[in-house]
A protein has these predicted regions:
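Hydrophobic/aromatic-rich alpha-helical bundle segments in the mid-to-C-terminal region
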Residues: 106, 110, 123, 138-181
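Hydrophobic alpha-helical connector segments
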Residues: 58, 72-99, 152
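Helix-loop "lid/cap" segments that line or gate small-molecule binding pockets
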Residues: 76, 90-98, 106-114, 178-182
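Generic hydrophobic, amphipathic alpha-helix propensity
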Residues: 8-17, 34, 59-63, 67, ...
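Amphipathic alpha-helical packing segments from all-alpha helical-bundle domains
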Residues: 65-69, 97-100, 115-140, 146-150, ...
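N-terminal intrinsically disordered/low-complexity leader segments
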Residues: 1-8
Length: 184
């Protein structure tokens, strides 16, 4: 069921779960805590989501769909931007603890073994993003490779890891500039 077709109560549960998963992690948040936070009943929860695993899948799909929409907009709609400007926007869209990518990034480390179907949606998104970045790089550099697109994603992931450490300075700009040196 598409998110736009979910009733208000189900959307409330979905948003509460996304917030709690982002803040505390997938393993530290149980169904009872989500139900309490969403101010709903167990019957409502199980009617729409059937299980915590299904809720995790839907939460990640919600984030993934939002990210895809933004990336497509940056690459294909915002024609006035240069490739470097588009890469910058995509980078900062992802390298943000308050952004849509934080939950899928967290899922990489927390749910691979316990929720393989939900984890696969994150893998699918990352592969999609690599292809989009690769095609974007090809528009100005015919020698661009898939490895360049992979490296861009690794730079995003590195920035996220640094942001998660409160004792490290925010070096997102420096990481991105280092990557862009090869394309500027």
């Amino acid at each position: 069921m598409p998110h736009s077709d979910l009733p208000f109560r189900a959307l409330g549960v979905l948003h509460s779960a996304r917030f709690l998963f982002n803040k505390y992690g997938f393993h530290n948040v149980g169904v009872d805590r989500i139900i309490e936070s969403a101010n709903t009943t167990k019957a409502t929860f199980y009617n729409y989501f059937h299980s915590k695993e299904r809720l995790i899948e839907m939460s990640l799909t919600f984030q993934k769909d939002g990210l895809k929409h933004e990336v497509i907009s940056i690459i294909h709609v915002q024609k006035e931007l240069t490739v470097i400007e588009k890469l910058r926007k995509i980078y900062y869209l992802h390298a943000d603890l308050d952004g849509l990518y934080h939950l899928p990034f967290k899922a990489i480390f927390e749910i691979a073994k316990t929720h393989p179907k939900a984890y696969q949606s994150v893998v699918d998104y990352r592969n999609w993003l690599i292809n989009e970045i690769y095609n974007l790089l090809l528009t100005t550099n015919s020698n661009a490779s898939k490895q360049d697109a992979h490296m861009f994603l690794f730079v995003i992931d590195g920035a996220m890891v640094q942001l998660l450490d409160p004792n490290k300075p925010d070096e997102r700009k420096r990481l991105l500039e280092y990557f862009l040196l090869g394309f500027g």
